[in-house]
Structures are given as structure tokens and as C-alpha cells.
């Protein structure tokens, strides 16, 4: 294992422990990845507890989502990760989480997007410099056909190049960043804002 791969793998392992510890990636849910180079990514293997990841629980894939390591099976949602790396060369890490807040809020919001506005913490997202604008978070219906789901995500990405993440209804959050630390920051910001939105909804009823 070369030094770069070892470092990126450790970042994935550490992210899993942090996200599991916060309750945002329970049991074997969720998947994480990091860009290895222009043609490859490192992803968590399928069905592993994210708070107990080891070096053998991460594998390399190409950007079409194919495993490059015989005997290791990538997550079923690998294509949603590699799609992002192919779309934007600046992305270095992708995190998919299954928090209660993201799951519930995605079911409560009517329509195809959540609009965040007037929150100071919006500035935690890459490219956002003021609370006064809107951050649109698209919500895609869950689909076991990942290629079909990816085909619905792609047009949104192309039309919204500064999109910080998206939700899958009843499922969870996808967000990303130039580095793993950036992706983790965005997960944390999203979770704070999702909790705020849920409290606003509950108090307005």
C-alpha cells in the first residue's frame, strides 16, 4: 500500500468512526470514498459496520464503479460516488450518511427540494459567503436501480455546479468536498440545518 493510499484509507476509517459516533451512520449503513487519482477512487466495501472499519474494508474502483480488487465487493451505491468524481475533478471525498434528521426531513418536505435560507451556518458550505442567499438541496426519490437514480442526479449537478449535496428520500444525505475534512464539515453543517428545519416544522404545526 503506497503512502497516499494508506493516508486516504485512514481518513475514511476515521470518518466512519466520527460519523458513527454522532449517530449519522448507524450499523452497516452509509458509504464513504476518497479520490485516489484521476482514474480511481477508494470506497468502503459493502456491508461493513462504519464504526469498525479497518484497512481491508476499503477497496479501489475505477470511475465507472467497477472493483479493481478481486474478491472485494463495493457498495451498491458506488456509482453515486464515482459519478461525482467524474463530474467535478476538484472533488476529493464523498460521504453518504443515514441520519435520523436527513431521513425524516426528506420524507416531510413536499416537492423535489429543500430550500435553506437565512441561516448563518450556510456559510459552512463551499462557495457560500452569506446567510442571505438560498441553498437548494434537491431530494430524489429512492430507487434500488442505482444507474437510474444516477441518471436523475446528473442533470441537477450539471445545472447547479455549486450544489453542496443532495438527499435521497427516506434514505440519507450525499455531500462532498475537496478533502475529507471539507466533506465532514459539510455533513456537520447539513445535520445542524436539518435539525433546525425539523424544529421549525414541529413548532409551526
UniProtKB/Swiss-Prot annotation:
Pathway where this protein functions: Amino-acid biosynthesis; L-methionine biosynthesis via salvage pathway; L-methionine from S-methyl-5-thio-alpha-D-ribose 1-phosphate: step 2/6
Domain of life: Bacteria
Family: Belongs to the aldolase class II family. MtnB subfamily.
A Pfam family it matches: Aldolase_II
Gene name of the encoded protein: mtnB
Catalyzed reactions: 5-(methylsulfanyl)-D-ribulose 1-phosphate = 5-methylsulfanyl-2,3-dioxopentyl phosphate + H2O
Cofactor note: Binds 1 zinc ion per subunit.
Protein source organism: Pseudomonas aeruginosa (strain UCBPP-PA14)
One example of a Gene Ontology biological process annotation: monosaccharide metabolic process
NCBIfam families associated with the record: PRK09220.1, salvage_mtnB
Protein name: Methylthioribulose-1-phosphate dehydratase
EC annotation from Swiss-Prot or TrEMBL: 4.2.1.109
Amino acid at each position: 500500500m503506497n503512502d497516499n493510499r494508506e493516508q486516504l484509507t485512514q481518513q475514511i476509517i476515521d470518518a466512519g468512526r466520527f460519523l458513527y459516533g454522532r449517530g449519522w451512520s448507524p450499523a452497516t449503513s452509509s458509504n464513504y470514498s476518497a479520490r485516489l487519482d484521476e482514474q480511481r477512487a477508494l470506497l468502503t466495501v459493502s456491508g461493513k459496520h462504519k464504526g469498525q472499519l479497518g484497512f481491508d474494508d476499503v477497496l479501489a474502483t475505477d470511475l465507472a464503479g467497477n472493483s479493481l480488487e478481486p474478491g472485494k465487493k463495493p457498495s451498491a451505491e458506488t456509482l453515486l460516488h464515482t459519478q461525482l468524481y467524474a463530474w467535478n475533478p476538484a472533488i476529493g471525498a464523498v460521504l453518504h450518511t443515514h441520519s435520523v434528521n436527513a431521513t425524516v426531513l426528506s420524507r416531510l418536505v413536499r416537492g423535489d427540494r429543500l430550500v435553506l435560507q437565512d441561516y448563518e451556518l450556510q456559510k459552512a458550505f463551499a462557495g457560500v459567503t452569506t446567510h442571505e442567499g438560498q441553498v437548494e438541496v434537491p431530494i430524489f426519490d429512492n430507487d434500488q436501480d442505482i444507474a437510474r437514480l444516477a441518471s436523475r442526479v446528473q442533470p441537477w449537478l450539471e445545472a447547479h455546479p455549486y450544489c453542496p449535496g443532495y438527499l435521497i428520500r427516506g434514505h440519507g444525505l450525499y455531500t462532498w468536498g475537496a478533502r475529507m475534512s471539507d466533506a465532514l464539515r459539510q455533513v456537520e453543517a447539513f445535520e445542524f440545518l436539518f435539525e433546525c428545519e425539523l424544529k421549525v416544522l414541529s413548532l409551526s404545526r
